[in-house]
Structures are given as structure tokens and as C-alpha cells.
């Protein structure tokens, strides 16, 4: 892999009922194949998607729809059939040409960071570095770009409410009289 080639990033975020976003985990690798080789420890993008689906049960995977990502969609569909696992919901998102990548990232993330709505682990070094060096001269913006896509489509859970003390709880459906 060339030193300056882009990274593939798969990121998992959680959203609380009060719309705080927590970065749970991410994979950031250069020259990652679309699908790993069975029997070897090297996983591909689609393998990581199945792994994250099992671990985090995301409601949606957002995949940047570019010429380079077309094989991901084809492989994901065939792997779903092969594994008989259709638990992965995904959205193909075109980057758009209305604004630059840097402006798009800033539009999505800047306000949320400024009000303290996005929370990272101290051990997420690559993401911390990309956030603190964000700008026209930064070497890589792949992790922060993945975070922007995740945040753009992340919504708080719908079935949540607050009790009298202000604690969040999951609302339970009430039984109805059908007679």
C-alpha cells in the first residue's frame, strides 16, 4: 500500500435519547479487501460489516457511493444470500458536488462538537488526531469523514421517555382491549 493512499473506515456510533453521540468503535485500514479470504485472519470490509452488525446491531450502515465502492454493494448482497443473514440495513450515500468534502464534514460535525454532543474514547487516537488537525493541509480525513456520515444519519431512539426524576427509560407498549 502506498503511504498516502486513503484508509477504509468502518465506524459504530450510539445515540442517546437526548441526542448525544458516542463513538463506540472503528476500524481504519489501508488497502483492505472487499472480502477476506476464508481461513485467514485478514478480514475485508464486508466481513467487518457483518462483525459490527453482530456486535452493535446498528439500524443502518451508510456506505459512500463512489466508483470504488460498487464492489462492496455487490459483495454485500451476495454474502447476505450466502450466509442467509439479512440483518444489515445499508444506505448508499453519494458524496455530492454541492460543497467540498471539508465543508460537508464541518457542516455536519462543527456545531455538535461545539456544544459537546459528540463523545470519543481517549484511546481513539486516529480520530482525535484528524479532529485536531482538521483543515486544508491534513494528511488524512477518512475517519472524520466516516464519523460525519454516521452522525448525519444517526437518530435518537424513538421509544424512550423520561421518568419524574429525569432518568431515561424504554417505554413499554400497553395492552389494548380489542373487544
How does the language model describe each region?
Residues 1-91, 117-179:
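RNase H-like, metal-dependent nuclease domains and their acidic two-metal-ion catalytic environment used
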Residues 40-42, 97-99, 110:
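A short linear-motif detector with a strong N-terminal bias
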Residues 84-105:
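Conserved phosphate-binding/catalytic loops in two-lobed NTP-binding clefts
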Residues 98-100, 108, 166-172:
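General helical secondary-structure elements
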Residues 101-115, 133-137:
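Short, surface-exposed amphipathic charged segments that create phosphate/polyanion-binding patches used
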Amino acid at each position: 500500500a502506498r503511504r498516502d493512499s486513503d484508509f477504509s473506515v468502518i465506524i459504530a456510533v450510539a445515540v442517546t435519547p437526548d441526542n448525544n453521540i458516542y463513538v463506540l468503535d472503528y476500524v481504519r485500514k489501508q488497502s483492505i479487501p472487499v472480502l477476506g479470504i476464508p481461513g485467514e485472519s485478514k478480514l475485508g470490509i464486508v466481513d467487518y460489516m457483518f462483525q459490527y452488525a453482530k456486535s452493535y446491531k446498528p439500524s443502518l450502515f451508510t456506505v459512500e457511493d463512489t466508483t470504488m465502492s460498487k464492489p462492496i454493494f455487490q459483495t454485500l448482497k451476495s454474502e447476505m444470500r450466502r450466509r442467509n443473514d439479512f440483518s444489515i440495513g445499508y444506505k448508499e450515500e453519494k458524496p455530492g458536488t454541492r460543497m467540498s468534502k471539508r465543508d460537508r464534514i464541518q457542516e455536519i460535525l462543527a456545531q455538535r462538537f461545539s456544544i459537546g454532543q459528540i463523545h470519543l474514547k481517549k484511546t481513539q487516537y486516529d480520530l482525535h488526531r484528524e479532529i485536531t488537525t482538521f483543515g486544508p493541509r491534513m494528511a488524512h480525513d477518512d475517519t472524520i469523514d466516516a464519523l460525519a456520515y454516521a452522525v448525519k444519519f444517526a437518530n435518537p431512539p424513538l421509544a424512550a421517555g423520561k421518568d419524574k426524576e429525569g432518568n431515561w427509560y424504554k417505554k413499554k407498549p400497553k395492552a389494548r382491549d380489542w373487544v
